[in-house]
């Protein structure tokens, strides 16, 4: 790289050209070797934070001499020439050009520094430490920071791999548990369905039992009603029989009349016809049958069987024969 020619400071102050000083400020030493990089260039770059800090340092270094030179030139111009009105547009243009040039120079210097860091070997670094110790220390610090960042990245990757393995193991265990839970859920659902079916069957049985109980109750009520009607009919029939008087047959009255006509002759007990339960007051009155006929000529004598005439005749003949035999004796 060729050195720029030194010009007269008075001419530079008259032209107000500031870029010449800025270029001189970024001049690198001649003994610095900027050859091609060797192996491990990426190891010397460092992290993004290191690069940013390096860029800020270079920008401060580049802006310091330029600002100092600019202020000296302004002071010299103010003292040498009388004050004159300034054109604002021209000054703004000059300022914008200065900042643009400063940014370009800073970018170029950063690129040169990166190339220098890539190309640095231990021998060159030792030579640089002898020439510029601060820069060598900064390069060493960047290398150490890069090594630490690599170590952190390696530890982080190892930790991530360990976590991935742990998560895979947990996922396998959880999948097995999920399979068991699904199997249990299937069994429980089948058992639940069976219990529902049994519950429906029990409900149907309960409904049938209720219907059967209702039918039995209805049948019982019907039987009670039927039994009550029969009991009422029997009671009415028995009460009717109690009110109906017993009709004395005709043949005991005839026999009694015959006995009175024969003078009170009595037959032995074996020849006497059987007598029903006849009241004594009816037997004592010979005209009882006629009184009964007069009291109820139709109703109560309808049950008498008048066709039993031979029995009456037989009893009379037996009584007559008995009276004849008694008279013969």
Curated annotation (Swiss-Prot):
Expressed at high levels in roots, low level in leaf sheath, but not in leaf blade. Predominantly expressed in vascular tissues. Keywords: Activator, DNA-binding, Nucleus, Transcription, Transcription regulation. Residues 134-155 are annotated as: Basic motif. Residues 132-195 form the bZIP domain. It comes from the Eukaryota. One of its GO terms (molecular function) is DNA binding. It is found in: Nucleus. The keyword Isomerase does not apply. One of its GO terms (cellular component) is nucleus. SMART domains: BRLZ. It holds the Pfam family bZIP_1. Binds DNA as a homodimer or as a heterodimer with RF2a. The heterodimer binds stronger to DNA than the homodimer. Transcription factor probably involved in vascular development and shoot tissue organization. Binds to the DNA sequence 5'-CCGAGTGTGCCCCTGG-3' present in the promoter region Box II of the phloem-specific rice tungro bacilliform virus (RTBV) promoter. May regulate tissue-specific expression of the RTBV promoter and virus replication. Belongs to the bZIP family. This is Transcription factor RF2b. It comes from Oryza sativa subsp. japonica (Rice). The gene is RF2b.
